[in-house]
């Protein structure tokens, strides 16, 4: 069977660089999905993306849809004919819709009755008749948050469209997409190569653009070219390039023909904290900083031009000229900020609102000071240093440097605190209070930093929940989900002995009368436990494992973590399924019973050998398990409990729990309650599927 190559390229004005890759990947996914939905076989689907184009190429495309069998059920036989034996209007209407007469319809008999049915073999359409619609539907599904119109065109897209290329092998697919008639023309680089190229065959793409248009349409090839050339350039400078993935992706999306160049700046600027210089280079200019082997910033940077110049030195000089004033500003702000201590900036925090109902940043700083000290006393950190770090934690927001370079908050606080002669732990906490900033980010390194980081986040959680502004849907303006995960990660990964109950109560207490939500403590804890669920699911723990632990509502994160890992391990044991089923059975029996259970098991009432055996096992296990529970050794405890499988199975095989004798019945219910209580000291195993 003949196989074809299909190409679609949408030529646009410059696309948003941070969205380019996602758009191209989604375009390929939806083209593939639409072909599958249309029952058209195809091979590999490749995507291409450059600043002014999105393209997809499909290999081994079938020439037509596969033929399909159609079956349309009509009215029930009882409704097909009237009293005179003539077809009813409903039957005739259905038949007409199928293109047949009632007499031509077949009959379908089932156990529920007999119906008319139309069956036919439908020949698939030629693929060239489908592709224009396939492309239009795929474009309509792209993740575009905001559309725009251009000219007098009613069509909308993320950016104005200038060309639409639709080729099936060497032929143009006739049609109109996004208000543009399809053609075989693709556009080359604005300033190099051929401005317009007429493709002779879909297989020429993207090589013809590379050769004649000076456009590297293959996104991944372009990215790898930039990475390779930047690494080589850094080596020539005697350093290593900071090729952060996000910036590398953004730069790749900004250029069609990457040319990697190096430039330098005056060494005097190295007296400014590297973070401020890097913020300017990466954030404002999209430059790659260069570091030496020891991690010190070098007075060089790497940038990517979108053109091959006869005089690259002119481009280099231009970029050096652009960045110099920004670095000079950073130097000026840094030197000016040194004239005032961090502590002296505290009064200015009174002029900035944290939140209208929750007070100013000075109010927040005072609360963080108190809560940091409270936490420090419980985790073994230096209490005075934690309090001091908490008090100063927002002072750098009042500096010129942070006002101009907002992403340096915390980092500049650390540098200024060191300049002021604050203890190193206090200085470091200024930076680390914001950690972790994102999933996978590093945690604070000292206990003082941990105390301040937790205090800052818990103060925000308590305050925002306390005025009823918790996250709803996708809206989370105070980043409470991120703050919660940060608190949980710090406590769990640092194994800190903190309880969410008392921690939240203390954070709420420090607000005084400002909060209006009486249920704030429970609301915060419920929210945090919900984030626990999401976090452990991402780690690969099953939903029912997490639910089994959540049923016990443990509020000490380190303890919660130990329980989840214990239950996950328990699931791997041979005895797990049987004991989970037994726990579910026990739970149901106890829930349905109206009988009260005894405080203690009545040994004299035990008659059946299996219940005597189970009771004996429970007595022995209780003695053995208590120290394990107290030490939080839940995995060891569940391994011991796994030994109950045989006596539990034997009990249910030979004993009628709901005996007629009330004394025997209540005693057996007591035995089951004691069994369940042992498991519940870890988790509700009955919830395991």
UniProtKB/Swiss-Prot annotation:
Entry keyword set: Aminoacyl-tRNA synthetase, ATP-binding, Cytoplasm, Ligase, Nucleotide-binding, Protein biosynthesis
One Gene Ontology MF term: arginine-tRNA ligase activity
Any single GO CC term annotated in Swiss-Prot or TrEMBL for this entry: cytosol
Reactions this protein catalyses: tRNA(Gly) + glycine + ATP = glycyl-tRNA(Gly) + AMP + diphosphate
Location (main, coarse): cytoplasm
Enzyme Commission code: 6.1.1.14
Enzyme class: ligase
Domain of life, per lineage: Bacteria
InterPro entries assigned: DALR_anticod-bd, Gly-tRNA-synth_bsu, Gly-tRNA-synth_heterodimer
Location in the cell: Cytoplasm
UniProt xrefs under PROSITE patterns: AA_TRNA_LIGASE_II_GLYAB (PS50861)
Transmembrane segments: none
GO terms classed as biological process: arginyl-tRNA aminoacylation; glycyl-tRNA aminoacylation
Cross-referenced PANTHER family: GLYCINE--TRNA LIGASE, CHLOROPLASTIC_MITOCHONDRIAL 2 (PTHR30075:SF2), GLYCYL-TRNA SYNTHETASE (PTHR30075)
Quaternary organization: Tetramer of two alpha and two beta subunits.
Family: Belongs to the class-II aminoacyl-tRNA synthetase family.
Record-given protein name: Glycine--tRNA ligase beta subunit
UniProt source species: Sodalis glossinidius (strain morsitans)
Gene responsible for this protein: glyS
